[in-house]
Amino acid sequence: KSDPERRFVVVSAPGKRNDEDTKVTDALIKYYKHYIKGADVKADQEWIINRYQAMVDELGFKSKEMVNISKAITDLATLPIEDNNFLYDTFLAAGEDNNAKLIAEYFRNNDIEARYVHPREAGILVSSEPGNARILPGSYDKLEELRESDEVLIIPGFFGVTSDNQICTFSRGG
């Protein structure tokens, strides 16, 4: 609110709340590993969903978006495992993606005109290199168009979309 010129917020996945806590990205990696092994993933799903719910509770608002976030987390376990080079990236990107949805809702609940923007809508097209995506040159023109928005745009970081519509992440920590 203090800077009306700020039009974009790029969101990371929730990190550690304390030294004993787990980053959501690390929890998603664990979930992915259990899923591809055919192990029970219910505890992984619940932990991640509860982590987002804890954020809502701490921020003190009633979230309608939690239904969609819960579904997005559980739906990861319905994706095909075989011949899916982008499965790991899709799991990892869920941290940023769901956090962006939640932050956009929080902003709106605090009288800030805000909108979640998926990297696909933002035009963040990337190379098809799982875990090491590179932004394609044409993306910058599309991103420039977003500056015309009157809303604060909440965009998940860490990933883009390939030309064949696959979620593809940048290198972790990069």
Predicted segments with their positions:
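Nucleotide/pyrophosphate-binding catalytic subdomain
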Residues: 1-174
